[in-house]
Amino acid sequence: MRNWKYLLAVLLIMALFLSACGASAAPASNLAEAPEVAEEPAESAREVIPDEPYEAVEYSLYPAPEGGYVGDVMPFVTEDGTLELYYLYDTDHNGQGYHPIYKFSTTDLCEYEDHGMMLNFGQMSDPDPALGTGSVLRDQDGLYHLFYTGHNDTGNGGKGKECVMHATSTDRENWVKDEDVLFFSPENYSKDDFRDPEVFWVEEEQCYWLLIAARENTLGGVVLKYTSTDLKNWEVYGPIFAPMAQYMLECPDLFRIGDTWYLTYSWDCCTYYAIGDSMNGPFIAPRDNILDGQGTISGNGFVFYAAKTAELGGNTYLCGWLGRPGVSGDSGIYQWAGRVLNHQLVQNEDKTLGVKAPEQFADYFTIDKLVHAAAREGNAEVSGNNISLSAEPGSYALADMGTRPATMTLECDVTLDEGGCAGFAFGGSAQDETFTVLCLDAERGCLHYEGYEIADLENFDPTALTRFDFSKNDVHHVKLVCENDVVVLYVDDLKALSSHIFHSTDGAHIGVFANGCNASFSNISMKIPG
């Protein structure tokens, strides 16, 4: 009996002890879950950057005419330093006659005046029911000349579809066409592919040169040279450039920086260049001779096309156009003609060329905008104006910098792992939480944007890209210039990728990301117009 009572007492004591342990075990359990509880604030931190008001702006840096698009550009610098951009006016509803020549002008590459139509197309019975690219110059007597392409699909009675035509003006606003065709293509050259005359005075030879895109029967696309002393009678000289690479070398342009000569030309939906020691050549195309993007879908990849140069304030600018989107939304598919797009050329030590944003933009974007950043996905650390990202293969890290202003520049220094992919992300607003990404892709060796989300990058190939060698520098200086949907990415004053990114507008946020790699974005600064 006594043993039974003793045993019962022991059991009661043990029960009380276990009950006490159970009461104290609850807090221990909460601490074990503390990491999960601690993650809640991290989740909340991904939402701390609220949406800001967004209002689209009137295009200023990248204009287009109302109801139309900018086609091939013909730059001319006036005596007072104004840059005039004559261009082929295109629409979505061209008739039998099309591509009249219109004009913008600017003194700072930031704001443009629209002068409207300068030269209309002719009748179907004329050699020019469609106009093609040309050039403007001032002769030694002060008269202005516009040389341009006349195009008629009927073939002009067997003479050819394309010819060189001419107009004159005393004020560059009122142009008078010559009645007669200057000339058609010479013997052994295609009658239907003969266009884009570029005319200029050569002091050393005391004559005018005319360079034109032509197609020789055996050489293929060439830049053909003519000379004249009176701008009326022209003598064919022969090709100064025949790479035997492209079907045509459209919109040829010859210019000099220092003691080196350069020839730009366009085909394959992009602008190329070649280098020579003399204006007569020989010209050699560098292995990598595309400065802005190129589409990978034939006929629908006009990223930066038909660019010609203008010298302004001691700098040389490459003046062309960014094609209009070929489908709705972001795709990297761009059709012929769109918006004015100018890059400032940079001559490298090895005489190759690079591009950067026009220096005039510094006087346009004058207000510093404070950037507030926060981790959004994965391992992202923010310290002042520096962001570090780390992501294992198959995952990504993302930091959010808030609503993207309609017009802005953003500069920073970027490092990323060899073979990594990082860049800028757009989206993440209350209306659309998805992010699409503008990539610095060291794995593929290019810059690209197609409207892909981060998770889809590895499943698709780029449709609009600029080749880029990331091995040349450990740190890459990057600049974004944004105006509404137009987003231009410059890297190391070497290359650009121009895009339409609609997913970056209408209140979308801008951020930075790293996909399966480590990346850092340092010295981040954002500016908006004053």
Describe the role of every protein-language-model region.
Residues 254, 410-414, 470, 474-491:
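Short tryptophan-centered beta-strand motifs in secreted/extracellular beta-sheet-rich domains
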Residues 493-509, 514:
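Short, solvent-exposed beta-strand-to-loop segments that form ligand-recognition rims
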Residues 378-393:
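Short carbohydrate-recognition loop motifs
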Residues 454-477:
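Short, aromatic/His-centered strand-loop micro-motif at the edge of beta-sheets
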Residues 522-526:
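Extracellular beta-strand elements of beta-rich domains used
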Residues 22, 31-196, 201-249, 256-300, ...:
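Beta-rich carbohydrate-recognition and catalytic domains
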Residues 389-452:
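Secretory/extracellular carbohydrate-interaction modules
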